[in-house]
Swiss-Prot record:
Pentamer of two alpha chains, two beta chains and a gamma chain. It holds the Pfam family Fer4_9. Its cofactor is Ni(2+); iron-sulfur cluster; FAD. It comes from the Archaea. This is Coenzyme F420 hydrogenase subunit gamma. It comes from Methanosarcina barkeri (strain Fusaro / DSM 804). GO terms for molecular function: 4 iron, 4 sulfur cluster binding; coenzyme F420 hydrogenase activity; flavin adenine dinucleotide binding; nickel cation binding. Its EC number is 1.12.98.1. [4Fe-4S] cluster 2 binds at C199, C218, C221, C224. [4Fe-4S] cluster 1 binds at C189, C192, C195, C228.
């Protein structure tokens, strides 16, 4: 590949589980870094003090309002990035950090946390606690094709990313209640159980073929809403499903035998 894009990982208040999920791509991650992207910022992996110019910023974690450096960092990330991706449910919806009230070690004064979309404009949401390695990998490949691919590749990349861009436009709330209002109560649920399978705390069970949520267990991560095939209807993606999978597979295979 002639033109590699610049990708950065910006860590806010989170557990680093999303970065671990990214690393779980193993050879797929190496392939992306070899051929498609330069990792120009990542506090966990690289000694870079200041946020640089980036094509794609993967932001993990919510923003602590009492940590003024974090507030400035997220604003700086928006200024210096072409595409900002909320990586994981803490960045998308606040997740379990919404329940923080301060008093914890080592920063007892840190008591208020917001999803990044409450402070800046976000282009793409990747919900999940954590998101699957495959989803993160696919978004990275599609971001490259959107910025550096030919016209056909850019069109397919746009169609693939559209549902995740629509999630970003929807807002910063995500819980089983949204699934209940938008899907179940509208008669759209087909009882597939994907929402229950995606819940990281097992707050959703299937009762008589329909999902039932335990509000006391829900951590507001939005994984169920993002995973539900009926939470959005994207007629652009469905006819292109095979082409999109093929273009991702080809991108990851290309150049494997160049040694």
């Amino acid at each position: 590949m002639t033109n590699k894009i610049k990708i950065g990982h910006v860590h806010m208040s989170g557990c680093t589980g999303c970065l671990v999920s990214l690393a779980d791509n193993n050879l797929g991650l190496i392939k992306i870094l070899d051929d498609y992207a330069d990792l120009v910022y990542c506090l966990t992996l690289a000694d870079v003090r200041h946020i640089p110019e980036m094509d794609v910023a993967l932001v993990e974690g919510s923003v602590c309002l009492q940590d003024h450096e974090s507030v400035e960092d997220i604003k700086e990330t928006r200024k210096k990035s072409k595409i900002v991706v909320a990586l994981g449910s803490c960045a998308c919806y606040g997740n379990i950090t919404r329940f923080s009230r301060g008093g914890q070690h080592n920063q007892p004064q840190h008591e208020s946390y917001l999803p990044i979309g409450d402070l800046i404009d976000v282009d793409v949401y990747i919900p999940g606690c954590p998101p699957s390695p495959e989803l993160i990998r696919n978004v990275a490949v599609m971001a490259y094709l959107l910025l550096e691919g030919n016209e056909e590749q850019k069109e397919l990349a746009g169609k693939y990313l559209k549902p995740l861009m629509d999630l970003a436009k929807r807002g910063t709330s995500g819980c089983f209640c949204d699934l209940m209002y938008d899907v179940i109560n509208q008669g759209l649920c087909m009882g597939c159980g994907t929402c229950a399978a995606s819940c990281p705390v097992h707050a959703i069970t299937l009762e008589f073929g329909k999902p039932q949520g335990e509000r006391d267990l829900c951590i507001k991560c939005g994984s169920c809403y993002g995973a539900c095939p009926r939470s959005f209807f994207n007629l652009d993606v469905i006819p292109e499903f095979e082409n999109i999978n093929e273009i991702i597979a080809n991108a990851l295979k290309e150049g494997e035998s160049d040694d």
